[in-house]
């Protein structure tokens, strides 16, 4: 056996000599083989081989320790050199190394064992040599070439094979390999606590258990996705948090490319594809607008984007704005004449500051300029047209902008709607004003202005913006302005109110100085409750009533007036189970509320000269006067309603007498307040103040015909004040033309009743109050183009307006046919309307003949008046309204006398007869225009009323204490309801109005009572100025004395050839 092992010792020595350079420096390896070398090859060490051993042909490869490419390396780099040198002198078998060095080398290093192909590895010391068998086994069994040992086929079944998979199937693969086998990439047997390999290698067997799944191999698409993900993370850090909420809802896709060469499984799976899951959402996201959602807005994104794209409110309408100087001037006019009287809108310091900075929306500036232009005297703003139409061009632009944004509520548009409604109210456009008011109310509720909110409701819940005191007060005042507009516009008989008092849960406005200087203070609600009471230690004024100013009590006064209107005109009186004179009736409750409201005013708001001066210094005197006028008007309105109950059974005399006293006291008080305002030059410009003056005037008309001399004198003086105020208001608010006409009608009815002396109490009917909102029915479409005094002609109904109604018959009766034919008068009016402006300046033809019939005379006067008045009228163009012009009447223009006999009796110096001397161009300047407007008719006995003695020459010729010729007192036999409702008394009038139809101008009562028609004696009185003393004569011997109607000149009296006032258009020539 030994001889076979060493049969060719030369060949063995040559193979060792051809080894690597690693062992060249070891002399023992190159010497003659020692006995230990022969012992190393002894067959006893290979007893496991089953066949004879003939020697290895390539034995040098077994003992080769390094590759030829690494022969240049230093031997010191290999610590195995000492091991091999010791191996030559030891008696250990081939392949056996000391265990001490092996364990020390394996345990002293944490690095993995070197690979056997590495140049630093030693095949003799590689622990993997045990993988092919134990040390007692021979190498000739083929395991060195990768073959399996015989025992592998008969090895027991591994323990892990008994485990099942999650699906319950038999496991074919090892679930987990140890760390050593994983590093060497060999198959692990999986035994625990140590696998076979680790037992052979005598190393520690460790199984690393982890829950993290292995990451997939990074592909090309994933490699491109990494920088995109990093860039996305950077962008997310820059995006605001509010927008991250939207971005977080979109899941970022993770793209996994398909492995090339693989075929997708045809088996149906439970998981859906990416297209099926994310396809619709991705399409919607791709087609959505690119702009993000507006912050602080919960409306649908489509509306937000649409509004954002055409967000022109900040600069839309800028081309129609006037100059900066006019804007600031009209803003001051607005806060001096409109603010606080109609509505408490806008915060003046904020508005003026934004106006100077140019940050106000043009639509708001246009609206303010439109409503304020009527009150300015600036020549850059005023035009040849009437005052109330000066701002119509600006209003039309503002209204177009507002109507295009009706579905987007905001405070700016809402404020513009309220102011535009007031402007259209003044131009007699009732349809527009009514519609704008309703639109504003709906928008206010949409903005939740009826709730006292601390945060802006338009913001999102996550970004609530707390409102400041000024902003909360502005919201409250806008809502109260909507409430007032609803009460004003719904005061008519057929116009119910929309806003209920219990729906407004906000406090009343604070004092004006608190609002201007940003001083928070608690106030009461409309029902008297305090929503947010404070203690005196909070730094605020604790008394809520003291914190309320003029605006708060004005709102309470108008709210009470609305309840009175509901009771008297909208069915509340019929629902009252008790008669009004009973203590349990609703009427008595309203009466007590009216009286208690005035008594509940704080000391700073009670009327006195001192408080009026204080408010004048604060520039709120007009508001202070307007509030007290409204309080007195409530007393007048509710007290006068009791006059209709005096005919009923069971009424107490005290009830009627107290109501009568309260009515006259309130009417006189209103006139005193108007006179006080005129003396202080505090113009009360609120339209409702004009209605209060109108109601007071109707009471003064009844006082003039009273048998009480003191009441009569007071009524005459107060009537003069009221009528003068109404004529002044007529320039700014068009509906006062209608009110003046109604006052004229009532006054003529009172004079007719006084002259007739007939008892009309038996013919009295239920009184019909003229409501503040009734002008809507009188002026549905503004004023007429030609006269500017008549309501606009009713347009023919559109044929499509009755499309949903029943089909009517197309046949006409004879009466209906003739009613459609135009009358000669209407034809003349049409010719007058169609006449051009140059033709209107031609002089009217004189007519000296007496008409045969009174009716014919009236028609001729009306046609002549239209030509005469047209000479002085100029029409405004380009304003965009139906009423393109108005009468600018010159009160110094005189007419030709229609009665030559009467004209010769007038003094040649009388200004009323100046046209008789047309060649004289001089007109006395000491006659005020108001006096030239007076026209005196005749009474029953030729006496002059005491009030007019200071006005007329010859007015002191007779004693006025005789009163009427028969000494009859006119209060008896005269029903208040008859006069107020316009009922005509019969008897004593001799049918003078039987041939005259009632018209809008009021000439039906004008000419029938004049001296030129009735044949009575003409008056010798002529005007004297207020600032001149009456002549010191007792009687004029040259002229006949005639009775004078004291207010015929004011309301269109008899036809004496003087200038008489027209009911709506001002004064009008009464001559041929």
Swiss-Prot record:
SUPFAM superfamilies: Zn2/Cys6 DNA-binding domain. One of its GO terms (molecular function) is DNA-binding transcription factor activity, RNA polymerase II-specific. It is found in: Nucleus. The keyword Kinase does not apply. Pfam families: Fungal_trans, Zn_clus. Induction: Exclusively expressed during infection of common bean. GO terms for cellular component: nucleus. Zn(2)-C6 fungal-type transcription factor that has a role in the establishment of the fungus within the plant and/or the progress of the disease. Regulates the expression of virulence factors such as SIX1 and SIX6. Multiple copies of the gene are present in highly virulent fusarium oxysporum strains. This is Zn(2)-C6 fungal-type transcription factor FTF1a. It comes from Fusarium oxysporum f. sp. lycopersici (strain 4287 / CBS 123668 / FGSC 9935 / NRRL 34936) (Fusarium vascular wilt of tomato). The gene is FTF1a.
